[in-house]
């Protein structure tokens, strides 16, 4: 069953709907230590936004960077290496467990663990202040059993239809 859930979350099954809250909860429970390691490390840094790529962070810009023209030299100035071995190991472990992206913006830390073919993603999010996570195109969000942690679905098309007019 665990292998099936991991395959679903990693997108290996060709699944075109997001995982259920129960599936995300199981993923969270299996990866909680690594999630907390990364969360605790990022809490020590003083940046408004961060997008983690492998062993480096892009700071000052969020994952929407691909939609905004930024010169390579400007981007290089914003790349910071992660030198903490425990954090690097946690990031590698999360990637192996199906985590697609890790980013922080608007007081919300997001771990995207599933991405659909049409502007849908799903994962876990953390917000220390007890507020609901601030995630673009949020359509579902429920608290997990651990304070500050939530599972979410962000679906642009569903969000657009709900907010039309």
Predicted regions and their residues:
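Context-gated lysine
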Residues: 1, 53-56, 77, 96, ...
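Bacterial N-terminal signal peptides
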Residues: 1-8
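Secretory pathway export signals and precursors
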Residues: 8-9, 95
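N-terminal export/targeting and maturation segments
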Residues: 12-88
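Extracytoplasmic electrostatic interaction patches
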Residues: 87-165
